[in-house]
Amino acid sequence: MEQDLKEKKAQTAGLARLQKWCGVRDRTEQEARTKIKEVLSKMSEPPAPSTALDWEEDWVESLCGEGYVDDARCAESYTRVHLDHKRWGPLKIKAGLRARGVSSSVAEASLRTVPTHQWQDAADELALRRVAELEANRDRVIRWLLQRGFPQSMVWTALDGLESDSDS
């Protein structure tokens, strides 16, 4: 009886810790599972392996059910932040989402929320930043834009736009 009470208290404390962690920013299920394993390993009295697996599933179910963990919401947030603040292109953002454990379909859906012209505007803005370097190091600027995650078509469009502006 006392052991059951201790386990229940530890389980509740672990879940509360995870809820607080998830409240900081949007998290994916894979990130939550990784953190759960970390929380379980750092407990002063870790549960038995079979109990730990049960707790992990209970916690994931609870976090998802209460809205702390949502892959789609996390993907949309990640897409918005990395486009607006880091000026990443769609390819790099998709790779980042896949690394966080977001499924391809959810990642594609979050990328579709951004209109194509907004991606192109970001590529144009980044190309404009490097306009002074363009004549001497065109290949370097192209590689830089590609590494930022923009598809070749957007890179060429951005560079063509700069060249047509300079011709005018």
Question: Where is each model-derived feature located?
Answer:
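An alpha-helical, amphipathic repeat domain used for nucleic-acid recognition
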Residues: M1-S168
